[in-house]
């Protein structure tokens, strides 16, 4: 079945092979064996079981499907300083000219360069090194500690141990000086106490707990930067906030957790709400609104682009929002004027918060003050109390030494509010009182003068009539003269303006005909340097305005 047969199979051979395969699959015949004597599964497809033609496999096998066995690599390292035997006595041809060894050339020699090499002196010829051929794998070649001798580190440990013993001796001498033990004689008890104290000090210096973190940070400026850059051990990593196996919030490649890992938890208790929280903070909402406005404007045919003209887009968006707010306010005002109900939209006054105080006060169950200072009353009168439907408090109005209400100007405390009508009635009442008072004074004056002026009334009245008539005639004459003068001045002014306009036209024509470089300088030393009002008005009427949009307008319809 799986063997590569050189000759062509006959029909009967092919039929027998198929029947044998069916029997093996049904378990009626034993399974086929490979080169190593292992059974081959009869259910393996033929395209997997057949070996390629270039392998020349004469027997059924699955060897071509198995992985290539890895060659066993050396795990050791090169022997350091190993030699093959004794050194030569004479220089050999092809050896190193410096040391005389045959295993390397002169340029690769690791010996100290000699003034005269072994080639010329035949002295101190070095033995040949052992050349090893190690087949190292990928990891062995790149292992930095491959071939390292751990016993060589003992020298470093000895140096540190010597330094530690010297430090302990010095510390012990300082403790002896502190305890006043300057003499050479020492008791064993003193030595034990001092050594115990020395051990305690070393344990305290080596310990590092949460209580000593703050003092360590204030040691010097060099240690501050190091400690600040270290991550606090109490910090929780992002991926530890959500340990649900079925969730896909945390992305290890970018080390980001965009969504909230605990959506069902209380927002006040969550310390981390996802990386998307930062994207919706700050001015991101304003930028999103601006981008939406630009897209909608482009759909409607307006040229608005944030990338090419951000300032223009921002100004257009601000103008759009302002007009939108105006339109909204306009419709609101129209609805309120039509249907009313503005009083229901007013916000309630905020309740004043109780101010905090450090004064200790204690009250009894009945509400009586036991400890603390009593509150000083600002006024003996009740504040903000509106009596009898008044809109203002009692004492908001003052008139003739009496207090009253400012809303209706009532001077009686128990009176009900009469509103604006009460104000009008009060004003009328005051006017009537004033008129009545004036009439009484006039009547008293008339009664006093009636007796003295009865005889001279007729003569004085005729004289007054004559004087009044003459004064009226003079006033009429003066009015006519004034009108005549005004008319004359108006005519003179119109004539002067016409003359000034004519002169200005001539001057404009001259300035057009002449070259600008030949125009003389208008000096104030000329005779007619004083400009009149008519000349100034003519100049303003005839002056060309370049900024006027209708200056060059021509009507082509005629």
Curated annotation (Swiss-Prot):
Stored Pfam families: Slu7 (PF11708)
Record InterPro entries: Slu7_dom (IPR021715), Splicing_factor_SLU7 (IPR039974)
GO CC term, one of those recorded: spliceosomal complex
Renumbered residue ranges of the record's region Disordered: 1-41, 428-532, 539-558
Coiled-coil intervals, chain numbering: 474-514
Compartments in which it is found: Nucleus
Any one Gene Ontology molecular-function term assigned to this protein's record: pre-mRNA 3'-splice site binding
Keyword Metal-binding attributed: yes
Keywords: Coiled coil, Metal-binding, mRNA processing, mRNA splicing, Nucleus, Spliceosome, Zinc, Zinc-finger
Compositional bias annotation for Basic and acidic residues: 10-25, 466-478, 489-519, 545-558
Taxonomy, superkingdom: Eukaryota
Biased composition regions of type Basic residues, renumbered to the chain: 479-488
Regions of compositional bias (Low complexity) in chain numbering: 430-442, 450-465
Zinc-finger ranges (CCHC-type): 94-111
Biological processes per GO annotation: mRNA splicing, via spliceosome; RNA splicing; RNA splicing, via transesterification reactions
Function statement: Participates in the second catalytic step of pre-mRNA splicing, when the free hydroxyl group of exon I attacks the 3'-splice site to generate spliced mRNA and the excised lariat intron.
PANTHER family registered for this protein in UniProt: PRE-MRNA-SPLICING FACTOR SLU7, STEP II SPLICING FACTOR SLU7
Protein name listed in UniProt: Pre-mRNA-splicing factor slu7
Organism: Dictyostelium discoideum (Social amoeba)
